[in-house]
Design a protein with these regions (language model features):
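… and, occasionally, acidic/histidine-rich disordered N-termini of signaling adaptors
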Residues: 7-194
């Protein structure tokens, strides 16, 4: 009985330590999410991860002439998805730093190449299908144009009572199944009234 009690106590302590680490990781992951949104654009976000940490993130980068917006659903749940979301977030930033003058499709294509390179270095056998599904938008303020590129994701533009779906490409970002050099399509929406991804 004392052996069983001791083993039970060890398991409880291990569980508590893991739970504490995951709660702290969730707090760290939240710091990657935008704290504020551009004042001239109505942006609403509902972020309710299934687990404390996971692979769902959103990203906003505001410039005087344009705004980059991304919604990302990384493969995997829990801790693996969270790690992948950190890598994806890093590449979303890097692709903008490398070229601020790109279309949404070029931007998503660059993120795809960066993620593929990172994942192929991590797993030489490349048997897993890590990556993400999601959409990126670039809103150009002066032209009042929204560009959209999607990876197994769609954008919906709601105008009054009519909703129009703009489908993305049927290829996940980072997937080893995508031909090298694949380019995501850019879709243009003039004066979007109620677009959401």
């Amino acid at each position: 009985s004392t052996l069983i009690d001791a083993r039970t106590q060890e398991l409880v302590e291990a569980r508590d330590e893991i739970s504490s680490s995951i709660r702290y990781a969730a707090k760290l992951q939240k710091t990657l999410l935008p704290k504020s949104f551009p004042g001239d654009i109505d942006i609403e976000v509902e972020w309710r991860p299934r687990d404390l940490v996971g692979g769902d993130i959103y990203f906003i980068k505001d410039f005087p002439d344009k705004v980059y917006i991304a919604v990302v659903d990384c493969t995997g749940h829990g801790v693996p998805g969270a790690f992948l979301s950190i890598i994806a977030r890093s590449h979303l930033d890097k692709a903008i730093r490398e070229n601020e003058n790109q279309t949404a499709g070029e931007y998503l294509s660059e993120v795809n190449e960066l993620l593929r390179a990172t994942l192929s270095r991590a797993d030489q056998s490349n048997t897993n299908e890590e990556g993400f599904d999601g959409g990126v938008c670039i809103y150009r303020r002066e032209a009042r144009t929204l560009e959209f590129a999607g990876a197994k994701a769609s954008l919906f533009n709601v105008d009054g009572e009519e909703a129009t779906e703009v489908g993305g490409d049927r290829k996940s970002v980072g997937s080893s199944r995508i031909p090298e050099g694949f380019k995501y399509a850019t879709h243009y929406i003039k004066r979007p009234s109620g677009a959401f991804v």
